[in-house]
Amino acid sequence: MIQSNLNMEKQDLLICSNLKPNQLPKLLDEALSVAAEGETRDMLLLSLLTNCAYALPAMRMLHGRPHHIYSPELLTMIVAPAASGKGIMNYGRLLLQAIEGNTGKKVYIPANSSASALLKMMDKYDGRGVVFATEMDTLTQTLRAAYGQFGDIVRCIFEHETVSQLRRQNNEFIEIRNPRIAMLL
């Protein structure tokens, strides 16, 4: 079971590993067949859901008062010790390899990208992509480095707020309206 920081009883948490066959779409059921029960299955399901969002470019939903329009990209962090099976998340990437191959567009954005590289990739691919790393350290070390300080960009991505950058050297202006980036760490 994925741990929660909320004060909830164990029985109140969604335990993905207890899902019965046919409770999920067939694609997800079949993809989960490679995982053992328990936490490994939970991690794979979260990876699949985070990656699936990229394949739903036209999906939007209203949430909150006043209503805000959101898309289904998830920002997912799985916290677990080393050698705990987080590598199973790589199977979620298989869902999108066909999209990368057929369109020529890069889906995945390296978690150790600089802030400028992140914005350039977002600009090149219409504000869409998936930041993926099986180790959260990849991103946290990048955020601490001078070149990778893009915590503000991640917060804007979460709310689908416009992100922009102006570089004096080349008079380069980048603006991404309604960024739709999923993150899996």
Protein language model features and the residues they cover:
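Phosphate-handling catalytic cores of nucleic-acid transaction enzymes
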Residues: 1-185
